[in-house]
């Protein structure tokens, strides 16, 4: 298990996940930025263009939460995309390695009480991403990984960071 960490930014909070992925950076870039590939792992459908300042719309497939507006905050092809997703700021960074690439996901938010819930969600999302890249299908049921790892994040982050329960669909 590659667990995420929680950082106190003095009024804001950040979840950090780093995954070593044994696929070429270009392939992973497509998986994290192209809507038809994002459906395999991201919690909502995404529409819009990856242009700094451009609007994004996030819609909830399969009952996975409410719709959100967003905005592209930073974009560097093949290496970085950052966007506002509701009130959160999501940053995805890719760095090439000889045997694949390193993906870093950062989620910056205001309410510490959702940290364990969202960490378990991102953990499942990243497992879905690697399953899709490796096999083209999931090796677990949606929500299953969330249920497995959520207690670990509650224990790691504490009760203050565990005020909210599972998201829709978990």
Regions found by a protein language model. Name each.
Residues 73, 80-133:
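Beta-strand/loop substructures that line and gate deep hydrophobic ligand-binding cavities in soluble
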Residues 11, 18, 112-115:
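Active-site oxyanion-binding pockets that recognize sulfate/phosphate
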């Amino acid at each position: 298990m590659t667990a995420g960490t929680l950082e106190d930014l003095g009024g804001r909070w950040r979840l950090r996940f780093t995954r070593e992925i044994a696929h070429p950076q270009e392939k992973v870039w497509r998986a994290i930025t192209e809507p038809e590939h994002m459906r395999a792992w991201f919690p909502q459908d995404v529409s819009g263009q990856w242009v700094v300042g451009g609007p994004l719309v996030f819609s909830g497939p399969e009952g996975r939460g409410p719709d959100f507006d967003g905005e592209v905050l930073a974009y560097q092809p093949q290496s970085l995309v950052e966007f506002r997703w509701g009130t959160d700021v999501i940053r995805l960074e890719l760095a090439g390695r000889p045997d694949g690439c390193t993906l870093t996901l950062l989620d910056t938010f205001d309410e510490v009480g959702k940290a364990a819930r969202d960490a378990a969600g991102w953990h499942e999302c990243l497992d879905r991403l690697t399953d899709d890249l490796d096999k083209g299908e999931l090796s677990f049921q949606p929500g299953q990984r969330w249920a497995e790892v959520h207690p670990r994040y509650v224990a790691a982050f504490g009760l203050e960071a565990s005020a909210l329960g599972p998201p829709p669909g978990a």
